[in-house]
Design a protein with these regions (language model features):
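Auxiliary Fe-S-binding modules of radical SAM enzymes
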Residues: 66, 77-201
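Proline- and acidic/polar-enriched loop/turn elements at helix boundaries
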Residues: 12, 54-55, 152, 198
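Conserved non-cysteine loop/helix-boundary elements of the Radical SAM core domain that shape
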Residues: 3-47, 55-77, 98-107
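Short hydrophobic alpha-helical runs that function as membrane-insertion/retention elements
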Residues: 9, 50-51, 147-151
Length: 201
């Protein structure tokens, strides 16, 4: 049965176009304006919501966080019906790649970004990925984050069973808990785990 897709998240990586050019040398992704306008194209195409993310640490994280928030804010004003979400990934060690040196974003800086998003756009959802350790994620969902992943694989093609030539993991996972373990942790923090955020009637 065909399921309609209705949500798009785009990882802009950095809003510094000069830095962006050094990271993407070929393919469609290298065209900065095309990438930048992806969320608006998705909303025009009928998506109910869009997500935004800069990879914090590729460039000045405060500038990228500000640009991410402002980008989302402008689209929220233009498309008030749209659901808006932020992801807050920090640059982590990359397997088989020692050429990208992160501009370190430590836990206090990550907390600053997450709280800034929450204050700036109080109705947006905020995701904290398994790049972060169990302690950080458990604390952030008690402060400002609304979504966390669990039981994740970051290998390219790793969710497809019939692909033989699968890629390496894209980054190291810091929180390896299963879905059941994360579910229980949320209950232990007096939070209500919700496995889906909408129901079609």
């Amino acid at each position: 049965m065909y399921k309609r897709q209705d949500y798009v998240t785009v990882f802009q990586e950095t809003y510094n176009s000069d830095k962006y050019e050094t990271l993407h040398l070929a393919g469609h992704k290298r065209i900065f304006p095309y990438r930048l306008n992806a969320q608006e194209r998705a909303l025009k195409g009928g998506m109910r919501g869009v997500g935004f993310a800069a990879l914090l640490g590729l460039d000045d994280f405060r500038k990228d966080a500000f640009a991410t928030g402002y980008h989302a804010y402008l689209l929220q004003r233009k498309y008030p019906h749209a659901e808006i979400a932020f992801s807050c990934p920090r640059l982590r060690p990359i397997i088989n790649n020692d050429r990208i040196n992160p501009m370190d974003v430590h836990e206090p800086q990550l907390l600053q970004v997450v709280c800034a998003y929450r204050l700036f756009m109080p109705f947006a959802s905020i995701t904290v990925s398994t790049r972060e350790c169990e302690r950080v994620r458990d604390n952030l969902v008690g402060i400002a984050a609304t979504k966390i992943s669990a039981g994740v694989s970051t290998g390219i093609g790793s969710h497809v069973e019939d692909i033989e030539d699968k890629g390496d993991d894209q980054f190291e996972i810091s929180d390896g808990r299963s879905v059941d373990e994360v579910y229980k942790a949320l209950l232990d923090h007096d939070l209500q785990p919700v496995m889906n955020d909408y129901v079609y009637l």
